[in-house]
Amino acid sequence: MRLIAALALACLLVVPARAEVVSVPLPGASEPTQTFLWEAKAGKKVLIMIPGGEGHLGLAPGRTSLGGFYGSVLGPLAESALTSGTTHVVVFDSPHALPVGTTYPVSRAGADHLARIESVVRFYKARFGKPVWLMGHSNGAVSVAEFIRRNPDLVDGAIFSSSRSGVQVAPSVSFPVLFLHHQLDGCAGADPRSDLRLIDQLRAAGKRNVSFVWLRGGSPEQKSPCASGYHMFFGAEADAFKAIDAFITAYD
């Protein structure tokens, strides 16, 4: 009986993070920005993730689950059974597709796009009253870099995963920065050597709260190398969310 009671108590304590789509208004815009939120039970920080590709997921109010890369790499950050469970996770959804460009996705520096990121940052900072971190994956890393170049005081940390070549971060940025790449990433636009050179420049300028993590597990998929497999941490999801969680909680 005691064992049954203990198991029942454990089940009650391990409660999944609340998940929902939250609409964030943008003054002057005809439509809000849809976001997907995993709300941690004991959140200490907010992590807002800007997706790669064309940045448009098609989120709609009423949705309570999000799978794929988002559910397997980001969702666990709000789950105490898998990580510290102390991060509220937000996935940003552009209301329209953002052209990927050929050499640099200039759409990621567009006024409407950056204004939407700012409104989402301010919305969740007000909602939770916690430090807000930004994470960008692939093309989304460009969005994060462009945003913090203009609004460094609104951000408390940044994570660049599988980032597209061309991302720049100024040494004057005071908050912690993590770069995350898979060693076997076959996406031509995501050259980790670019980020390694950037880290060398940042450290040479005296920045110490910057780190680079290689992922080595996982497996490829028979799909586009920039939308699957190693680039999306397929099979290495646990290594990815553990690395992210360890970096974020190091700055609690």
Show which residues each predicted segment covers.
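Short beta-strand/loop motif that positions the catalytic acidic residue
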Residues: 173, 179-181
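N-terminal cap/lid segment of alpha/beta-hydrolase-fold proteins
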Residues: 19-42
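C-terminal catalytic histidine-bearing segment of alpha/beta-hydrolase fold enzymes
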Residues: 207-252
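Short alpha-helix in the alpha/beta-hydrolase fold that links the catalytic acid
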Residues: 188-203
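Primarily recognizes the serine-hydrolase "nucleophile elbow" in alpha/beta-hydrolase
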Residues: 122-174
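Alpha/beta-hydrolase active-site loop
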Residues: 72-73, 101-127
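Short, surface-exposed "cap/lid" segments of acyl-processing enzymes
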Residues: 41-81
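Conserved alpha/beta-hydrolase
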Residues: 74-99
